Amino acid sequence: MAKEQQVQANDLQEKLIAVNRVSKTVKGGRIMSFTALTVVGDGNGRVGFGYGKAREVPAAIQKAMEKARRSMVTIALNEGTLHHPVKGRHSGSKVYMQPAAEGTGVIAGGAMRAVLEVAGVHNVLSKAYGSTNPINIVRATIDALVDVKSPEMVAAKRGLTVEAISE
């Protein structure tokens, strides 16, 4: 039931990662509803994800997109790749990402690829360990991307210059 879709809306890239049918059992039978997992990004270091649930698929997607737009975070990129190798985890999912040379492309699978593409990461090597549940992979990927620190951020935190750190 998982599918991907990309739509341009006010310069944000939107991707639908997964649609799932779920049911609630009540006295009279089952009540079916749908969940949608989406990510949005500006392709330049801002990314967010949303998880929506409704009785109809379009409504679930709409809710997920709204939540994704409201939960956007900014990440530090280095000319389309990461500054340094980084790990992230959420629940049973663990992800590892490392910078890659120009022309490598996004080496990632499924949900992680969607997050990296909308975030504006063009060259990266990545691997998912443990659970490959799309929601947990998305959360772990964003957790890892938030941990990326640019040399300027590290220098400011240490009270040094960028040149002093790179030695």
Curated annotation (Swiss-Prot):
Q: List the disulfide bonds.
A: none
Taxonomy of origin reads: Bacteria, Pseudomonadati, Pseudomonadota, Gammaproteobacteria, Vibrionales
Any one biological process term the GO annotation gives? translation
HAMAP family linked to this entry: Ribosomal_uS5_B
**Residue stretches making up the S5 DRBM domain:** 12-75
Membership in a protein family: Belongs to the universal ribosomal protein uS5 family.
PROSITE patterns per UniProt: RIBOSOMAL_S5 (PS00585), S5_DSRBD (PS50881)
Q: What is known of its domains?
A: The N-terminal domain interacts with the head of the 30S subunit; the C-terminal domain interacts with the body and contacts protein S4. The interaction surface between S4 and S5 is involved in control of translational fidelity.
* Gene Ontology cellular-component terms listed: cytosolic small ribosomal subunit
Q: Reply yes or no: does the keyword Nucleus apply.
A: no
Question: What protein name does the entry list?
Answer: Small ribosomal subunit protein uS5
Q: Which UniProt keywords apply?
A: Ribonucleoprotein, Ribosomal protein, RNA-binding, rRNA-binding
- Superkingdom as given in the UniProt entry: Bacteria
Per the entry, what this protein does is: With S4 and S12 plays an important role in translational accuracy. Located at the back of the 30S subunit body where it stabilizes the conformation of the head with respect to the body.
User: Key word Glycoprotein present in the record?
Assistant: no
Its subunit composition reads: Part of the 30S ribosomal subunit. Contacts proteins S4 and S8.
Q: Which Pfam families match?
A: Ribosomal_S5, Ribosomal_S5_C
For molecular function, the Gene Ontology terms on record are:
rRNA binding; structural constituent of ribosome
Q: Which SUPFAM superfamilies match?
A: dsRNA-binding domain-like, Ribosomal protein S5 domain 2-like
